[in-house]
A protein has these predicted regions:
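N-terminal helix-turn-helix DNA-binding module of bacterial transcription factors
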Residues: 1-64
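Alpha-helical recognition/docking segments in bacterial nutrient-uptake
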Residues: 1-5, 66-173, 238, 242
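Hydrophobic structural packing positions in well-ordered secondary structure
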Residues: 13, 24, 42, 68, ...
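Short beta-strand segments enriched in small/hydrophobic residues
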Residues: 21-25, 60-75, 183-190
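Glycine-rich phosphate-binding loop signature in dinucleotide/nucleotide-binding domains
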Residues: 49, 116-118, 178-181, 236-244
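Hinge/beta->alpha junction and helix N-cap segments in small-molecule ligand-binding domains
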Residues: 73-82, 100-109, 160-170, 186-234, ...
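Periplasmic-binding protein-like
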Residues: 119-126, 183-187, 241-252
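Glycine-rich phosphate/diphosphate-binding loops that line cofactor/substrate pockets in enzymes
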Residues: 172-184
Length: 256
């Protein structure tokens, strides 16, 4: 079995495949059309020689990293895992790699780990970047798509979001009309979190639409975290003169 040698060069690949160095370069950088027959031959030769293009040289030649970044404030989320699997599948299908990093937008002592210096574009999940960070990257015309978050009003950045208000409204209305519930407790997430805000808005709208007064005492803080939700509910139940409730609507899976 042929072992990879660090001394294998692009010229050797070209000679063995019977093509020019320029053709090999075009194949590696995918910046010009090459016939299917030549592409297959180069693929086979590179595999036989165990030739791996130098990433830095490839990037310099093409001005592309062929890497898509994904930035999130947390990777420990039941919702995040299936989403990540789908993103990775699409990225690889188009010949790109996926670079994943966590970053908290309140950490001003260091720049975001993903950006124009190491990716061709970026997916920003939830609160991965502050509005100021987004504005700065957008000013540099760096391609971005926001996931599970709407862009600042001043920016036209593509976004993929969930209709939180509509879904929460329908869930609460289902509890009211089908299960005849009138005292519905709501576990919200962090107060300034976008998803939490719109789910609470949908909750309140459904109560109002069905003639049920909103009772602020039935809105508890779960912080999108199971331990916090458990502690909050335990404290609520142990309280004297407990407010009656006949259903619980949680704003996330962890609280549920």
């Amino acid at each position: 079995m042929t072992s990879k040698s660090d001394s294998v060069t692009i010229r050797e690949v070209a000679q063995k495949a019977g093509v020019s160095v320029a053709t090999v370069s075009r194949y590696i950088n995918q910046n010009a059309p090459i016939s299917k027959e030549v592409s297959e031959r180069l693929k086979q030769v590179m595999a036989e020689l165990r030739y791996v293009p130098h990433a830095a040289a490839r990037q310099l030649a093409s001005q592309k990293t062929r890497v898509v970044g994904l930035l999130s404030n947390s990777l420990h989320n039941d919702f995040f895992v299936p989403l990540l699997n789908g993103i990775e599948g699409v990225v690889r299908k188009h010949g790109y790699n996926l670079l994943i990093a966590t970053y908290h937008s309140d950490n001003r002592n260091m720049p975001p780990p993903i950006g124009p210096h190491n990716t061709d574009g970026m997916l920003v999940f939830s609160d991965g970047l502050s509005d100021d960070d987004l504005i700065a990257l957008h000013a540099r015309q760096f391609p971005m798509v926001l996931v599970h978050r709407t862009p600042p009003d001043s920016l036209k950045i593509p976004s993929v979001t969930v209709e939180n208000k509509k879904i929460a409204f329908e869930l609460i209305e289902h509890l009211i009309k089908v299960h005849k519930r009138k005292h519905i407790m709501f576990f919200r997430g962090p107060i300034h979190q976008e998803d939490s805000f719109w789910r609470e808005t949908g909750y309140k709208s459904a109560l109002m639409a069905n003639g049920i007064p909103f009772d602020e005492r039935l809105v508890l803080n779960g912080d999108f975290e199971r331990h916090a939700a458990y502690q909050t509910l335990s404290k609520f139940i142990a309280t004297e003169n407990q407010i009656p409730f006949d259903a619980i609507f949680t704003g996330d899976d962890d609280a549920a």
